[in-house]
Swiss-Prot record:
Its EC number is 3.4.11.1, 3.4.11.10. GO terms for molecular function: manganese ion binding; metalloaminopeptidase activity. This is Probable cytosol aminopeptidase. InterPro entries: Leucine_aapep/pepB, Macro_dom-like, Peptidase_M17_C, Peptidase_M17_leu_NH2_pept, Peptidase_M17_N. Mn(2+) 1 binds at D268, D345, E347. Presumably involved in the processing and regular turnover of intracellular proteins. Catalyzes the removal of unsubstituted N-terminal amino acids from various peptides. Mn(2+) 2 binds at K263, D268, D286, E347. It comes from Allorhizobium ampelinum (strain ATCC BAA-846 / DSM 112012 / S4) (Agrobacterium vitis (strain S4)).
Length: 497
């Protein structure tokens, strides 16, 4: 189960029984708080014995020194100050959280010699702790043996000279980011029998408590709008589709909104073009794009972002029954363009094309960004270390790449072009939904591009990063919540008033 961490901030602290964590810069002699924590100077001996060099994210765990009230002392290496980047404070917080087991009271000294720590860095350290503390075991009926010994909550005190400013920042922004990421992770981790399109739409509706305006379009309403592409995907499932439309109005009333659209295929069998059985259980995560969008909208509303933002979720289930869409079917999208369905497992783009057109037609946004676990081809190209970025606008793309570097939710820009676009021309309709074996992630993006007009647009293919990505300092869960921090940073950096 997730550890419950209750974090406070203080400029100083008296050490009582419990765990003490201290940061240490690689070239400094002593860790943070050494005069308080280590009056007998045992750290230097322990570090020499263990050959501890305080490399970034390394840990030295020692018994508390004589004269200290603490039970344990853990020193976390920060590496060389010159090598630290913004997202390293998140990682350091994650390392700290990974070493809390069994502790009820924890004091963390952050102001190490050689480090320049800001309120933003402390905020990010706290965020990293909370993200690392997350786990998903809601459906386990038997606890691990050590769960019974775990405290109901761990009291964390972050000790730093910038405590007051950090506390204000965390309250205003940090908690909102954590809650948005964890919302996205929870949704991706949930089994599909629990989270169908209707249930997902209900989760969107719950954002009304934060001041988000939410509309849920039913199957009938989508049919009246001509969303034949989205509805074609849904027709094989007994679970009806939904389109969730969320509006956060934090900017000027006349301000042009920005828009985020998420693919929400709550389970993807592939339809008639059915997937192999091996690994199909992971297709409960094929709504990772929609999860990121709802997490982002939660974050923007919770921190009262000064921006007008639209979030749209296309929510369907792709199943193979007697009413399912067939290869060779031709559907008419909301745009009026016709699509030959070559492969029913290329369904995400069919959902997104109607959602994109609806968004552009109704809201006239300044830009649209869609997120989707869209293609296996992006995994072949980029593994699960970068998400694919496709865009028709260089400024938007550069802003996204910058936010990716800042948050370590990394993107790699992929090509688009007329020669790729020709690959999705159809003999029988305006286009087909797959372009063949080669360049699959690119032809999928070219398909989406046909539905955005001249509006600045970016497509993030997060098939490799939304789930089953490598575990790291801030995430040990199958679901990552990828996209929430990235897009929140994008809004902060470039689009918030």
């Amino acid at each position: 189960m997730s550890m419950k961490l209750e974090i406070s901030f203080a400029p100083s602290a008296l050490i009582e029984a419990g765990l003490v964590l201290s940061l240490k810069e690689a070239e400094a002699t002593l860790p943070a708080g050494a005069a308080t924590v280590d009056p007998s100077g045992i750290f230097a001996k322990a570090a020499a014995t263990a050959k501890f060099k305080a490399k970034a994210m390394s840990v030295l765990d020692i018994l508390a020194p004589t004269g200290s009230q603490a039970d344990r002392l853990i020193v976390i290496g920060a590496g060389k100050a010159a090598d630290l980047v913004d997202h390293d404070w998140l990682r350091l917080g994650g390392v700290a959280a990974a070493n809390l087991k069994g502790s009820e009271a924890v004091t963390v000294f952050l102001d190490a010699d050689g480090l320049t720590i800001t309120a933003e860095g402390v905020r990010d350290f706290a965020i990293g702790m909370l993200l690392r503390a997350y786990s998903f075991d809601d459906y386990k009926t038997k606890k691990k043996d050590d769960d019974d010994k775990a405290p109901s909550a761990v009291q964390i005190t972050l000790v730093t000279a910038v405590a007051d400013a950090a506390e204000r920042l965390f309250a205003a922004e940090g908690r909102a980011v954590v809650d948005g990421v964890l919302l996205a992770r929870n949704l991706v981790n949930l089994p599909a029998n629990v989270l169908g399109p209707v249930e997902f739409a209900d989760r969107a509706k719950a954002l009304e408590a934060l001041g988000v305006e939410v509309e849920i379009l039913t199957e009938t309403e989508m049919a009246s709008l001509g969303m034949g592409a989205l509805l074609g995907v849904a027709q094989g499932s007994v679970r009806p589709p939904r389109l969730a439309v969320m509006q956060w109005k934090g900017g000027a009333p006349e301000g042009q909104p920005i828009a985020f659209i998420g693919k929400g295929v709550v389970f993807d069998t592939g339809g008639i073009s059915i997937k192999p059985a091996g690994g199909m259980e992971d297709m409960k995560g094929d709504m990772g794009g929609a999860a990121a969008v709802i997490g982002l909208m939660h974050t923007l509303a919770a921190r009262k972002a000064k921006v007008n933002a639209i979030g749209i979720l296309g929510l369907v289930e792709n199943m193979p029954d007697g009413n399912a869409q067939r290869p060779g079917d031709i559907v008419t999208s909301m745009s009026g363009q016709t699509i030959e369905v070559i492969n029913t497992d290329a369904e995400g783009r069919l959902v997104l094309c109607d959602a994109l057109w609806y968004c552009n037609d109704r809201f006239k946004p300044a830009f649209m960004i869609n997120l989707a676990t869209l293609t296996g081809a992006i995994l072949v190209a980029l593994a699960n270390l970068h998400a694919g970025l496709f865009s028709n606008d260089d400024t938007l793309a550069e802003n996204l790449l910058k936010a990716g570097l800042s948050t370590n939710e990394r993107l790699w820009r992929m090509p688009l072009g007329k020669d790729y676009d020709k690959l999705i021309d159809s003999k029988f309709a305006d286009m087909k939904n797959t372009g063949g074996r080669y360049g699959g992630s690119i032809t999928a993006a070219q398909f989406l591009k046909r539905f955005v007009g001249d509006t600045p647009w970016a497509h993030l293919d997060i098939a490799g990063t939304a789930m089953a990505s490598p575990k790291d300092e801030i995430n040990q869960s199958w679901a990552s919540g990828f996209g929430v921090r990235l897009l929140d940073q994008l809004v902060r950096d470039a689009y918030e008033a």
